[in-house]
Amino acid sequence: MELVSVAALAENRVIGRDGELPWPSIPADKKQYRSRIADDPVVLGRTTFESMRDDLPGSAQIVMSRSERSFSVDTAHRAASVEEAVDIAASLDAETAYVIGGAAIYALFQPHLDRMVLSRVPGEYEGDTYYPEWDAAEWELDAETDHEGFTLQEWVRSASSR
């Protein structure tokens, strides 16, 4: 199964401020993001899950949480570790699971990712949440497409670092 991180980030790696995106909404980015993850399970932190309850993404939500809890959503599953999240996604017969944040979840999964799909928003923004740094030697830029308001980059972990 492939683990893929999906995020929108500014040039300074900012992904959020006070729980919101720090830049104006980019409808084309939101559309491609929702379309990409619609039919597959997503892995996200509890806070991110709670913030999206009115419009949950993905076919299932694997919510990372250290505390024992259940969710009042049939498609939500709790996981306490990367391994447990991967096992849950595999039990759902997923070929791909998308890691969609927040910052601590991105950092936790970074060493385990196969791909990153990053919407690069031009400019630097003030924020309190950042996408983790990655070792450029371990990644290859596979595709880059310019869109209005963002550039979509697809990164693949290099074969030598797997």
Curated annotation (Swiss-Prot):
Give any Pfam family that matches: DHFR_1
InterPro entries from the UniProt entry: DHFR, DHFR-like_dom_sf, DHFR_CS, DHFR_dom
Give start and end of each DHFR domain: 2-162
Enzyme Commission no = 1.5.1.3
Which pathway does this chain act in? Cofactor biosynthesis; tetrahydrofolate biosynthesis; 5,6,7,8-tetrahydrofolate from 7,8-dihydrofolate: step 1/1
Activity modulation: Activity unstable at KCl and NaCl concentrations lower than 2 M and activity increases with increasing concentrations of KCl or NaCl.
Kindly state which reaction or reactions the protein catalyses: (6S)-5,6,7,8-tetrahydrofolate + NADP(+) = 7,8-dihydrofolate + NADPH + H(+)
Q: Name one GO cellular component term.
A: cytosol
Recall the GO molecular function terms of this protein's record.
dihydrofolate reductase activity; NADP binding
Q: What is this protein called?
A: Dihydrofolate reductase HdrA
> Which species is this UniProt entry from?
Haloferax volcanii (strain ATCC 29605 / DSM 3757 / JCM 8879 / NBRC 14742 / NCIMB 2012 / VKM B-1768 / DS2) (Halobacterium volcanii)
The record lists the lineage as: Archaea, Methanobacteriati, Methanobacteriota, Stenosarchaea group, Halobacteria
Gene from which this protein is expressed: hdrA
